[in-house]
Amino acid sequence: MAIWQGKSMKKPSGGRAKMNRGKRKYELGREPAETKIGDRRVRLIRTRGGNTKVRLASDTRINVVDPETGKVEIAEIRNVVENTANPHFVRRNIITRGAVVETNLGNVRVTSRPGQDGVINGVLIRE
């Protein structure tokens, strides 16, 4: 079943609200990408205007910026350490923006949106 992002059918009192029009195509949503650790897999999604969006299903590498030197390196992701979006994402190794992942260079905070951009970028965290 599709995800509908339109107005709720409940009134503030909890009663049922009547629709004054039907649902529209632009109110449709999609399932979240839920990017995991694994071999690189991407899904191309057609968006409005015929544009494309790259959904990253899984990847093992991350582009890491060292804030002190400004140098970018590619690191291997080992596991997810922290995720403020959902505490259960840590257990399931799901990567979202703001997640902290453990790499061979150290802990890295993800700055890109893997489900929207199709790439994982991050900033090295100095302890």
From Swiss-Prot:
InterPro entries: Ribosomal_eS8, Ribosomal_eS8_CS, Ribosomal_protein_eS8_arc, Ribosomal_Se8/biogenesis_NSA2. The keyword Ribonucleoprotein applies. GO terms for molecular function: structural constituent of ribosome. CDD domains: Ribosomal_S8e. GO terms for cellular component: ribonucleoprotein complex; ribosome. Keywords: Ribonucleoprotein, Ribosomal protein. PROSITE patterns: RIBOSOMAL_S8E (PS01193). Residues 1-33 are annotated as: Disordered. GO terms for biological process: translation. It comes from the Archaea. Pfam families: Ribosomal_S8e. Belongs to the eukaryotic ribosomal protein eS8 family. Part of the 30S ribosomal subunit. This is Small ribosomal subunit protein eS8. The lineage of its organism: Archaea, Methanobacteriati, Methanobacteriota, Methanomada group, Methanobacteria.
